């Protein structure tokens, strides 16, 4: 029992240091936390809510380097995600140290998506400011294609929000070769709004009269990037359905570009024309 109290006291002191930490070596007692069986409880004793951004970055580096993906996911859910959101809520931005912590967290991509991105998007509570900041990090960091494909599949199946469109556009802009399962899920994601009544924004006249429903600009932008990057992976039927879609969900500036992309190029399953055999008499 004495050891328990002693450990409690040690990690409370470590927590006090982390609440003031700016630079320099961290206590050895903190560095060994990832190797302890009850590491989650130990982290809790250090009171992560009070960690400085510098301490959060240092801790993220230690945990990413020493924990397995499933454990990293827990650290992201229990500590890092809340630290990110609290800083954005208080300052409307993140510090350099927190930005670097987000970047470091993507070194374990499965843990990042399951511990930060999906919890952020689930339930529709993510703000556009949060999405813009985290999305800018995703855009700068290389992510393995299989993890990106799985993330796009999950995002496509989530309840729609504007930030979801932003994350989809950023991942599509990486131009990875995606499996058809992910392509098909994205097609369905867009086609679920082929009924105008499914639009998430409501237009109003100058007099305040409620008009028709429509999809936001972020949605049109993500559809345009999808058409630009993956039109050759779409079947003719999928292209036709998406062309019908933009006749319902219109946007004067973006719709013509989407139509042009979907109306050009090859389609999935189409045979390429065979090259003509050179006449023997013409060969040199």
Where is each model-derived feature located?
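Residues within HEAT/ARM-like alpha-solenoid scaffolds
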Residues: 9-12, 50-58, 71, 89, ...
């Amino acid at each position: 029992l004495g050891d328990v109290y002693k450990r409690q006291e040690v990690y409370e002191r470590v927590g006090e240091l982390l609440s003031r930490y700016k630079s320099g070596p961290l206590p050895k007692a903190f560095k060994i936390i990832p190797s302890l069986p009850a590491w989650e409880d130990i982290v809790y004793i250090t009171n992560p809510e009070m960690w400085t951004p510098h301490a959060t970055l240092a801790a993220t580096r230690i945990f990413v380097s020493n924990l397995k993906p499933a454990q990293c996911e827990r650290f992201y859910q229990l500590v890092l995600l809340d630290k990110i959101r609290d800083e954005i809520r208080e300052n409307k931005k993140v510090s350099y140290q927190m930005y670097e912590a987000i970047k470091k967290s993507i070194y374990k991509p499965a843990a990042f998506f399951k511990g930060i991105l999906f919890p952020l998007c689930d339930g529709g509570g993510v703000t556009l400011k949060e999405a813009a900041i985290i999305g800018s990090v995703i855009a700068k960091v290389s992510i393995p294609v299989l993890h990106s494909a799985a993330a796009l599949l999950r995002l496509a199946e989530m309840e729609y929000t504007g930030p979801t469109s932003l994350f989809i556009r950023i991942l599509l802009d990486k131009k990875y070769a995606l499996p058809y399962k992910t392509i098909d899920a994205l097609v369905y994601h867009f086609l679920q709004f082929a009924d105008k009544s499914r639009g998430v924004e409501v237009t109003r006249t100058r007099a305040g009269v409620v008009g028709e429903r429509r999809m936001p600009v972020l949605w049109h932008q993500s559809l345009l990037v999808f058409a630009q990057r993956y039109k050759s992976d779409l079947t003719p039927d999928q292209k036709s359905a998406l062309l019908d879609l933009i006749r319902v969900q219109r946007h004067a500036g973006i719709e013509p570009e989407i139509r042009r992309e979907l109306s050009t190029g090859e389609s999935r399953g189409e045979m390429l024309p065979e090259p003509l055999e050179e006449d023997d008499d013409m060969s040199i």
